[in-house]
């Protein structure tokens, strides 16, 4: 590997994880833009695709795996998963072994998330799961017990998402009862129910950054949310619409029409894509929307089956007008596809698989080292983890590993 390629790989990893910190931890709004001025984001998607390989397969579920999430607690690297077998499972990435199983749901588990609220406030390792049994449950990994249960929905609960503000204290959920519910994790109370969809709400997301200039994080709105002013929720439904909801006023702000079938996945953008939403649908398309105008910006066609999950990748590509972000989609057509977000031409790369893809997630993982190698917390790599309709979880990694020098990272902002 050339020195230039190594440098490009380090640069894009730095850029991607600074962007993640900006979203998750609320770093100053212009920090990412400052760093971009000093870091060239020229890491080619081809570098990942040409050197990627299957590194792990997690087996144990006995039905379709609907959801995965990743978290690094202390020195442990963990994945959690939710399945049609009604279980939530926890896996150790370093050993590829299942370390915990929660089986108190009585129906399919549709979504799982590690709880930032419990970790940052109580240093508890907790998973939140939503199920077709009409409940949302919280599980303590270390003590192997259920901590909380939310049961205000009247039908199955589909997508869930923690708030990026106030330490993840709030959770939103979409349901077969056609509603979105906003919960206070601290009190276990439902704060508000958003009505407007005409069918099942399969997916939800909360905007990563405030859309106005109100930085009073301690202000409480009229439904009891602290720090949520300026944030919005987006929801995708079987009614073929995407809707935007204002957390402060609880009003519906916009409706996006364009998909011809059920919407399975919605994702807010960040930074330069702050005013964009990405969506995937049973109509086999991926669409990009402008939040401000309510207009469709791009439509990406190429899949021959339902698009189950869309994600913003950590990669960028060079094109005729400069650098462009790369988005990723997983489908029932047994492919994962990469797209130039600025172009609706053919996909950049297609990963052909043996199973239908139900979900996917990019993960920063620590490099596995041999016993005779010196272990360093700064050795890390980017992995693509995906779930299949055939009960398995796979992890794909590039052969290239990236050693991030934290001192240099912070010096770039000066």
Predicted regions and their residues:
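Loop/turn segments within WD40 beta-propeller blades
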Residues: 69-76, 95, 113-124, 143, ...
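A structural motif specific to WD40 beta-propellers
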Residues: 53-56, 76, 97-100, 145-148, ...
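A conserved positional marker within WD40/Gbeta-like beta-propeller blades
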Residues: 62, 87, 98, 106-108, ...
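Intrinsically disordered, low-complexity acidic/Ser/Thr/Pro-rich linker and tail segments
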Residues: 1-69, 73, 77-80, 205-224, ...
């Amino acid at each position: 590997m050339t020195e230039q390629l190594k440098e490009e790989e380090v640069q894009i990893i730095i850029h991607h994880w600074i962007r993640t910190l900006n979203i998750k931890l609320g770093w100053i709004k212009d920090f990412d833009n400052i760093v971009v001025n000093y870091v060239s984001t020229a890491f080619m998607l081809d570098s990942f695709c040409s050197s990627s390989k299957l590194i792990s397969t997690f087996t144990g579920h006995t039905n379709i795996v609907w959801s995965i999430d990743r978290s690094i607690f202390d020195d442990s690297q963990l994945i959690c998963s939710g399945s049609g077998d009604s279980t939530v499972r926890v896996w150790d990435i370093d050993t590829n072994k299942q370390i915990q199983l929660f089986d108190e749901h009585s129906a399919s588990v549709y979504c799982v998330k590690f709880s930032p609220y419990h970790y940052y406030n109580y240093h508890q390792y907790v998973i939140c799961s939503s199920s077709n049994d009409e409940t949302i449950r919280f599980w303590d990994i270390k003590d192997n017990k259920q901590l909380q249960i939310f049961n205000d929905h009247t039908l199955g609960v589909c997508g869930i998402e923690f708030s990026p503000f106030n330490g993840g204290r709030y959770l939103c959920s979409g349901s077969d009862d056609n509603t979105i519910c906003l919960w206070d994790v601290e009190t276990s109370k439902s704060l508000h129910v958003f009505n407007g969809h005409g069918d099942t709400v399969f997916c939800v997301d909360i905007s990563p950054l405030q859309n106005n200039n109100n930085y009073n994080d301690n202000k409480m709105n009229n439904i009891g949310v602290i720090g949520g002013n300026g944030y919005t929720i987006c929801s995708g439904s079987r009614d073929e619409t995407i809707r935007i909801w204002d957390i402060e006023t609880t009003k519906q702000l916009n409706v996006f029409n364009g998909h011809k079938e059920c919407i399975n996945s919605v994702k807010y953008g960040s930074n330069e894509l702050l005013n964009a939403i990405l969506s995937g649908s049973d109509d086999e398309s991926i669409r990009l929307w402008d939040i401000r105008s309510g207009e469709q910006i791009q439509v990406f066609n190429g899949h021959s089956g339902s698009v189950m999950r869309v994600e913003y990748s950590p990669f960028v590509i060079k094109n005729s007008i400069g650098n462009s972000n790369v988005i990723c989609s997983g489908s029932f057509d047994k492919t994962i596809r990469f797209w130039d977000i600025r172009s609706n031409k053919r996909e950049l790369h297609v990963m052909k698989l043996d199973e239908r893809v139900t979900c996917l997630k990019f993960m920063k993982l620590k490099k596995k080292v041999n016993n005779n190698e010196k272990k360093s917390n700064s050795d890390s790599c980017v992995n693509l983890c995906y779930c299949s309709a055939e009960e398995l979880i796979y992890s794909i990694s590039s052969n290239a590993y990236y050693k991030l020098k934290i001192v240099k990272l912070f010096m770039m902002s000066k």
